[in-house]
Swiss-Prot record:
This is Pyridoxal 5'-phosphate synthase subunit PdxT. It catalyses: aldehydo-D-ribose 5-phosphate + D-glyceraldehyde 3-phosphate + L-glutamine = pyridoxal 5'-phosphate + L-glutamate + phosphate + 3 H2O + H(+); L-glutamine + H2O = L-glutamate + NH4(+). Pathway: Cofactor biosynthesis; pyridoxal 5'-phosphate biosynthesis. GO terms for biological process: glutamine catabolic process; pyridoxal phosphate biosynthetic process; pyridoxine metabolic process. GO terms for cellular component: cytosol; glutaminase complex.
């Protein structure tokens, strides 16, 4: 199995290290042709506006969207979640991939200095609580009827799934706990 990591900016190395720890081959996705050799893709955290600009400059936006619409499993964390979303609150004209039926609010959990971590129960990955690290995190403010909510914090979804797409407002790659990545890998192997 080969998992792509959208290699534009953000926590690329941390996702790569986690996947390699799990014995998975990674591909740093920088060009549309890289999408042809992967079984799933991670869209890491970073700065969401930069993502959109670089994706379009590298002709990756349309190719990635087509792959996702046709079933390529994806996991978006933080800014990656924003990229996957259908709508951005207060930014209705900002382009997104529109493959996850949610509305997000950017940086809703505060600025960099207000970043935090907390432990949350996520039943789909086991009984033990999971450390969720929020860094300038988006908030999911609305979900479509086919979106499953796997975890919440303060009554807001923080981990959702719709068809082949997983979306997280937090950073699982910044922990030593591989369970979120393992859950994603199960989605990639059918």
């Amino acid at each position: 199995m080969k998992i792509g990591i959208l290699a534009i900016q953000g926590s690329i190395v941390e996702h790569k290290n986690m996947l390699e720890r799990l014995g998975v081959e990674t591909v740093l996705v920088k060009k549309p042709e890289h999408l042809e050799i992967i079984d799933g893709i991670i869209l890491p955290g970073g700065e969401s506006t930069t993502f959109f600009t670089i994706l379009e400059n590298r002709l990756l936006f349309d190719a990635l969207r087509e792959k996702l619409v046709n079933g390529l499993p994806a996991m978006g964390t933080c800014a990656g979640l924003i990229l996957l979303s259908s709508r951005i609150e207060n930014h209705p004209d900002q382009k997104t991939l529109k493959v996850l039926d949610i509305t997000v609010s950017r940086n809703a959990y505060g600025r960099q200095r207000e970043s935090f971590s907390t432990y949350v129960k996520i039943p789909v990955i086991g009984d033990r609580e999971y450390e969720c690290i929020f860094i300038r995190a988006p908030q999911i403010v609305e979900i479509g009827r086919n979106v499953k909510v796997h975890a919440t914090f303060n009554d807001r979804p923080i981990f959702v799934e719709e068809n082949n797409i997983l979306g997280l407002t937090f950073h699982p790659e910044l922990t030593d706990d591989p369970r979120i990545h393992e859950y994603f890998l199960k989605r990639c192997s059918g």
